[in-house]
Amino acid sequence: NDWYPHYIHNLDNLIRFGGLFPPIHVQADIRRTRLLGVTHVPHEGGVLIVRAKDDLYRLSDLKGKKIGISRSMNQIKNDWWRIQEHQGIELMLRMNGMTMEDIQLVEFPYADDWYNFPEMLTPMENPSEWQLKRDHKHELAFRPLETALEKGVIDAMYSQSKVLSVLTEATGKFAIIEDLSKYPDWRLQVANIPAAITCTDVMAEEHPELVVAFMKGMIKVGRWSNEHKHAAAAILNKQTYYLDVEDTYRGIKDVDMVPNLSLLNLAAVEQGTNFMFKKGYIKNDFDVHQWAAPEFLEKASRELLEEEWKRVTTSKLPQTAAALETDRRIG
C-alpha cells in the first residue's frame, strides 16, 4: 500500500499514530474516527530561524522582512506542515507585540509527492520502518524552506523546536532568534502535537478487542520507554529529527510515553482544532471531547492491571485472588 492512509485514514483496519493535524482533518471532513489516546511533548512549540550572517537578532528586526511559508501541492492529504508554520509564526509574532501585518509572508509551493514513490512501496517487516527508507535527518522534505533561506530569498523561516531545527542549526549557516518552547504557556506548544492515536469507527465497533489489544501494547511500550529512556532513545533515533541518540534522549527524558486522554492534553487538541477551523484548514468543526473514546484506554489499562495482579498473586497464593475480576470500578 502507499502511505496516504497515514494522512486520510482510508483503511478501515488501520490504527494510526502520529502528528495531530492530519487526524483532525480526517475527523472533521473525511470520516468518523475515535481518538484513543495522545502523547505530548510539552515543550516543542516552534522556532524562527534566520541566516547566521544576517544582522537579525530579535523578532522586531524582521519588521517588513520576508518570512517563508510552504504550500503543499498535494491535494490528497492535509497540509500539516503549513498549518504548524502558520500557527507558530502567528504566535511568535504575537509574543513580540507584532502581527502578520508587520511582515511579508512569502508562499513557497512544493510537490510533496513521495507517498507512493516505488521505493516507499516495498515490503516492510514493521510499519515504523518507513523512515529507514529515507535519509530523513539530511533530506529536506520536512525542511522545505531551508534552501530559500540559505539563498536569501526569504529572511526567516519556521521550524520545530529542538527536533528539525537542531539539524538546520548544526550546519552553522543559521541561527534561532525566537523559540516558543522557552515560554511556560502550554497554549504555545502547538507544533502538530500532541501526537494522536486514532482508529476508524468501523474498527471500534466491529473489532473493539483489537483496539484494546493495540492500546495494551502502547501502554506497555510507553511504560518500558519511561523506565529505559536511553534505550528508547537509541531506538527512536532511527526515526526522529534530533541530532543523534543523546540528543534524542534529551528530547524525550521528560516526556510521558504512555498515552492518555487527560483534560490538559484534550485542551491542547482543541487548540489545534480551533486554529484549523478558524483559518479554513478544515471545513467542519467538531467536539473534541465527543471524539475522544477513553473506554478503550480504560479497558486496556484494567486488563494489564488484572494480568499483573494474577501474575503476582499466583506466585504468592494457592489460587489467584479475584479482587479485580469484577466489572465494578475499584476506588
Regions found by a protein language model. Give the residues of each.
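Short linear loop/turn motifs
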Residues: 104-108, 249-257, 287-302
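Short beta-strand->loop
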Residues: 33-42, 104-108, 173-191, 287
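Well-formed, non-transmembrane alpha-helical positions, independent of function
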Residues: 25, 61, 147-148, 166, ...
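Conserved C-terminal helix/tail region of periplasmic/extracytoplasmic solute-binding proteins
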Residues: 277-331
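Short, glycine-/small- and polar/acidic-enriched structural segments
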Residues: 1-120, 161, 323-331
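Secondary-structure end/capping motifs
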Residues: 204-283
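Pocket-lining segment of extracytoplasmic ligand-binding domains
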Residues: 114-238
